[in-house]
């Protein structure tokens, strides 16, 4: 844009789309490893306090996946906490990311269970745990990313 002053000057504006992509990239790059570490802490919490599921105990299995998802979303929230300008917005991001963490943990479990070669139970549990933790971290950040894209699309920076 050319300004109409004594001298011709150009105002340079950065594209909102390019800035948004860069910010999203940084948020995911920061949020993913922190969410993975937090999911690992959640698995330690599970080992201490949540009863181990027996075969067919869907409730205990779901609780363990939910705990890992909640821990992953809480860790990933470090990268996403200021997405909105209100406390309700931060809570919304956390809830959406927690749902994503739960879905990601479940997806990681079922994908890992199907495709991980398991010569013995110990190796299966190690690799399956890694798949669940990464799935929770990825799911939490993916849902937060979708929320950020939706908020940018609708021009919402404040959740009332």
Label each region the model flagged.
Residues 48-64, 105-136:
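Interfacial non-cytosolic loop connecting adjacent transmembrane helices
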Residues 25-27, 31, 40-43, 115-160:
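Alpha-helical membrane-associated segments of multi-pass integral membrane proteins
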Residues 36-44, 72-77, 101-113, 140-145, ...:
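Transmembrane alpha-helical segments of multi-pass membrane transport proteins and ion-pumping complexes
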Residues 67-90:
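Canonical alpha-helical transmembrane segments
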Residues 4-68:
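N-terminal signal-anchor transmembrane alpha-helix
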Residues 30-34, 90-109:
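Transmembrane alpha-helical segments of multi-pass membrane proteins
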